[in-house]
């Protein structure tokens, strides 16, 4: 679509005022730290390569299971409420109509921004998991190309799976608190469903 990169840049500039990117990176920093700490505390002193690689796999799996499956939908729900409500809150719909920007293009732009933030959060999670594994000697890091690629594909899947929650948020068009609660409950239900499926 013509003009889409400019619209995406505008959405990022609007979110920049709310300090969203530092918050996303901070969240992606804290969770891998906790994950690697749990992995390190469970190590038994085995120095074999297979065991150390297994500990890194354990940290990576925990990061995917909790950092992405549980936390990322909450993050995307909050971002969706900010992206879709800011025109309402700032009373800038009349400015958009004056440009004009097609509603479809505006929605696609906001969804692409959600996807970009999702990938930023995911890549930061993997990076910090790798860094903390090195720092705390909590395993042997390996297979990074595959792990980064798989995490990105996983993140895209989570973003797509979160779209029903985004639709609810936009449709009800209520307060930020209600949007966050909807995102939280949707995230918990999705995570619980994944746990049940993995156990069967």
Model feature map: region roles:
Residues 11, 15, 97, 163-174:
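Generic transmembrane alpha-helix motif of multi-pass integral membrane proteins
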Residues 1-28, 174:
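Aromatic- and glycine-rich beta-strand/loop motifs that create alpha-glucan
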Residues 34-41, 172-200:
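Transmembrane helix segments
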Residues 81-115:
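Helix-loop-helix units of permease transmembrane domains in multi-pass membrane transporters
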Residues 28-76, 108-172:
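Secretory targeting signals
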Residues 79, 91-92, 163, 180:
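Transmembrane alpha-helix boundary/hinge residues in polytopic small-molecule transporters
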Residues 8-15, 106-107, 148, 152:
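Hydrophobic alpha-helical elements at and bordering transmembrane segments
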């Amino acid at each position: 679509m013509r003009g889409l990169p400019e619209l995406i840049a505008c959405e990022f500039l609007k979110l920049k005022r709310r300090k969203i990117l530092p918050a996303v990176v901070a969240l992606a920093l804290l969770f891998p730290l906790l994950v690697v700490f749990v992995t390190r505390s469970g190590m038994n002193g085995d120095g074999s390569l297979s065991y150390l690689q297994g500990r890194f796999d354990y940290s990576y799996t925990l990061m995917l299971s909790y950092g992405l499956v549980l936390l990322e939908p909450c993050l995307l729900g909050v971002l969706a409420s900010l992206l879709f409500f800011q025109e309402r809150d700032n009373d800038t719909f009349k400015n958009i109509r004056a440009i004009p920007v097609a509603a479809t293009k505006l929605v696609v732009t906001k969804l692409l921004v959600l996807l970009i933030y999702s990938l930023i959060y995911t890549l930061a999670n993997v990076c910090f998991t790798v860094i903390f594994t090195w720092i705390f000697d909590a395993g042997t890091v390996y297979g990074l190309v595959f792990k980064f690629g798989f995490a990105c594909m996983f993140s895209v899947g989570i973003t797509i799976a979160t779209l029903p929650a985004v639709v609810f948020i936009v449709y009800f068009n209520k307060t930020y608190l209600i949007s966050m609660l909807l995102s939280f409950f949707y995230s918990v239900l999705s995570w619980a469903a994944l746990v049940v499926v993995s156990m069967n």
